[in-house]
Amino acid sequence: MSDIARTFRIEGVPPATGPWARAVEWNGMIFISGLRGIDPETGLPAGTTDQRLERILEHLSLTLEAHGSDLSSVVSTRVYVTDMNGLRPAVNAFYEKAFGEHLPTRTILEVSSLNQNDSIEIEFVAIRKKEPDL
């Protein structure tokens, strides 16, 4: 069995707001904890939905890079939104921009609330492409 590597801090990505790893890598798979659109300067959710999704994309890219991968290696996602009808179009546009022809699988769920009154949180699973920089 392969070793399990846990990442708790990634430069440029806000720290977790609780006791969990930012990412866990096992057997070439990268499991990334839910990312929200947190402004690293304030520690709070960014202003607009688009700004939150941009932050999620930035934090995802940094996390993948730290693990020797990139956006094209994302194979599965789970999206949590607090308003399906209002947020699904923005999430769809985000997916087209972020993943292009490399669309991962996706589950999208509406939830009653998220931490810090946020509106979107996304978990990711990716495949490692090369040895990580950890």
Predicted segments, located by residue:
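N-terminal presequence-like segments and the immediate start of the first folded domain
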Residues: 1-58, 62-75, 81-134
